[in-house]
Amino acid sequence: MPHYVVVKSPMRRRRSPRRRSPRVCYSPRRVACSPRRRSPRRRSPRRRSPRRSIVVY
């Protein structure tokens, strides 16, 4: 039987540490970084990504 395991895609792993790092806010608008995290728009793409990350081992 194929075992379905939800694995974080490599793209998410590389982007997540960069977003957490303060270097992401190198732009002159520091406030633009905080509202982006709170925006619900980022939550929708995250829900779609887990479906693609499902890998059959």
From Swiss-Prot:
Region of interest (Disordered), residue spans: 1-57
Biased composition (Low complexity): 23-34
Bias kind Basic residues: ranges: 10-22, 35-51
Protein name as catalogued: Uncharacterized protein 104L
